[in-house]
Curated annotation (Swiss-Prot):
It comes from Chlamydia felis (strain Fe/C-56). Component of the acetyl coenzyme A carboxylase (ACC) complex. First, biotin carboxylase catalyzes the carboxylation of biotin on its carrier protein (BCCP) and then the CO(2) group is transferred by the carboxyltransferase to acetyl-CoA to form malonyl-CoA. GO terms for molecular function: acetyl-CoA carboxylase activity; ATP binding; carboxyl- or carbamoyltransferase activity. Its main location: cytoplasm. This is Acetyl-coenzyme A carboxylase carboxyl transferase subunit alpha. It comes from the Bacteria. It catalyses: N(6)-carboxybiotinyl-L-lysyl-[protein] + acetyl-CoA = N(6)-biotinyl-L-lysyl-[protein] + malonyl-CoA. The lineage of its organism: Bacteria, Pseudomonadati, Chlamydiota, Chlamydiia, Chlamydiales. The keyword Cytoplasm applies. Keywords: ATP-binding, Cytoplasm, Fatty acid biosynthesis, Fatty acid metabolism, Lipid biosynthesis, Lipid metabolism, Nucleotide-binding, Transferase. It is found in: Cytoplasm. Its EC number is 2.1.3.15.
Length: 324
């Protein structure tokens, strides 16, 4: 597993404890109570390091190569999954994985953005950067879900929509805008979960829903920290400052009413205990579905409209009183 800078001290401590345990099998250098004392120190070290992460360190956790991706969530949560491909206009976009899923006996249309796990798969998936056909594919499956009365689950994990000339020529901006328009009026419950990177319009095109959730170390932003640093300071190395200024993580976005729920991750990030994350995400999806399924279509659409209508409202103080 690739090590992040803040993880090195923890890993060295873990190796030391493992070596003591191995040697103890032969020579009993340390008593079990002494080893337990070392393990408690390790727990305190982890708590200290991971409770005081900078926004940029959390971005690094979010981008960790071993972090669970959409296909991992499908394998970890679904009893059944039948993949559906193509946009019926141009081609299939491998950056989107979607299909009919069964989670704890309940059927969903599950649609996720997929980056890939190694060099060849990342190139095949275009590093999770959707082309117009990817957004059309997601919308096609969403409309199919509406037709058959299935709730929709979107898993968001993208560094952004593909900015290439070919994508622009095929109507990238229109494809994203059309998704926003169509998903806002779709007559079925929509649950959105940001599992990794949620960057710019690439994320937004699959993030219109009745409830928006994020994993603890995922981020949701109009731009990447590097892109922001390049624009503001003409220096992509100022990514740490940009990450702090963007307020891109769940606790800040929840205060702004952009996201509704922040799901905690295992200590160190989702890649340290994927099965626990799959369980928590599955429980969240089922819990929200039980809440949303009792709403009438009229109430569902009105609440969805009001949710996005009120994002961005703020109050200022004046001599005559607060103004919106």
């Amino acid at each position: 597993m690739e090590l992040l800078p803040h993880e090195k001290q923890v890993v060295e401590y873990e190796k030391t404890i493992a070596e003591f345990k191995e040697k103890n099998k032969k020579n009993s250098l340390l008593s079990s109570s002494e080893i337990q004392k070392l393990e408690r120190r390790l727990d305190k070290l982890k708590e200290k390091i991971y409770s005081d992460l900078t926004p940029w360190e959390r971005v690094q956790i979010c981008r960790h190569p071993s972090r669970p991706r959409s296909v991992n969530y499908i394998e970890g949560m679904c009893e059944e999954f039948v993949e559906l491909c193509g946009d019926r206009t141009f081609r299939d976009d491998p950056a989107v994985v979607g299909g009919l899923a069964k989670i704890n006996g309940q059927r969903f249309m599950l649609i996720g953005q997929e980056k890939g796990c190694d060099t060849s798969s990342r190139m095949h998936r275009n590093f999770g950067m959707l082309c117009p056909e990817g957004f059309r594919k997601a919308l096609r499956l969403a409309k199919m879900a509406e037709k058959f009365g299935l709730p929709i689950v979107f898993l968001v994990d993208t560094p952004g929509a593909f900015p290439g000339l070919t994508a622009e020529a095929r109507g990238q901006g229109w494809a994203i805008a059309n998704n926003l328009f169509q998903l806002a009026r779709l007559k079925t419950p929509i649950i959105v979960l940001v599992i990794g990177e949620g960057c710019s319009g690439g994320a937004l095109g699959m993030a219109i829903g009745d409830v928006i959730a994020m994993l603890e170390h995922s981020y949701y932003s109009v731009i990447s920290p590097e892109g922001c640093a390049s624009i503001l300071w003409k220096d992509p190395k100022k990514n740490s400052e940009a990450a702090a200024m963007l307020k891109m993580h769940g606790e800040d976005l929840k205060q702004f009413a952009i996201v509704d729920v922040v799901i905690k991750e295992p200590v160190g990030g989702a890649h340290h205990n994927p099965s626990a994350v799959y369980r928590d995400v599955q429980n969240f999806i089922l819990q929200e579905w039980l809440r949303l399924k009792d709403l009438s279509i009229e109430d569902l659409l009105e609440k969805r409209y009001q949710k996005f209508r009120t994002i961005g409202l703020y109050e200022t103080s004046s001599e005559s009183g607060p103004e919106a």
